[in-house]
């Protein structure tokens, strides 16, 4: 039996501007992640940055695979209104 370990990834998603509709952005992020069958969404919340700009903190569980979080980051960068995606942390789950 092959057991694939999983990784909890904490991402910070920065929008293009503070004028974005954050609820719509979170929904677009959720839809993109759900289209990736290997992702389990653990949580999503807004984090104030400065001058009205907020980051969306996204926590997901993905299989521990070669290439790390690259596919996840690339997929989120495809979402309209997303400017930057940063991996805050990644750790194996038990």
From Swiss-Prot:
NCBIfam families for this protein: aEF-1_beta (TIGR00489), PRK00435.1 (NF001670)
Its job: Promotes the exchange of GDP for GTP in EF-1-alpha/GDP, thus allowing the regeneration of EF-1-alpha/GTP that could then be used to form the ternary complex EF-1-alpha/GTP/AAtRNA.
Key words, A-Z: Elongation factor, Protein biosynthesis
Pfam family, one: EF1_GNE
Molecular functions (GO terms): translation elongation factor activity
HAMAP family reported in the protein's UniProt record: EF1_beta
Full protein name: Elongation factor 1-beta
Family statement drawn from the similarity comment of this UniProt entry: Belongs to the EF-1-beta/EF-1-delta family.
Lineage, opening ranks: Archaea, Methanobacteriati, Methanobacteriota, Methanomada group, Methanopyri
The gene coding this protein: ef1b
InterPro entries named among the record's database cross-references: eEF-1beta-like_sf (IPR036219), EF1B_bsu/dsu_GNE (IPR014038), Transl_elong_EF1B/ribsomal_bS6 (IPR014717), Transl_elong_EF1B_B_arc (IPR004542)
Source organism superkingdom: Archaea
């Amino acid at each position: 039996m092959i057991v694939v370990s999983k990784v909890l990834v904490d991402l910070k998603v920065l929008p293009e501007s503070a004028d974005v509709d954050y609820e719509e952005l979170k929904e677009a992020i959720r839809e993109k992640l759900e289209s990736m069958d290997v992702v389990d969404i653990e949580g999503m919340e807004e984090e104030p940055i400065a001058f009205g700009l907020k980051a969306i903190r996204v926590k997901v569980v993905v299989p521990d695979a070669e290439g790390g979080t690259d596919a996840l980051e690339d997929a989120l960068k495809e979402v309209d209104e997303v400017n930057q995606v940063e991996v805050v942390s990644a750790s194996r789950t038990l």
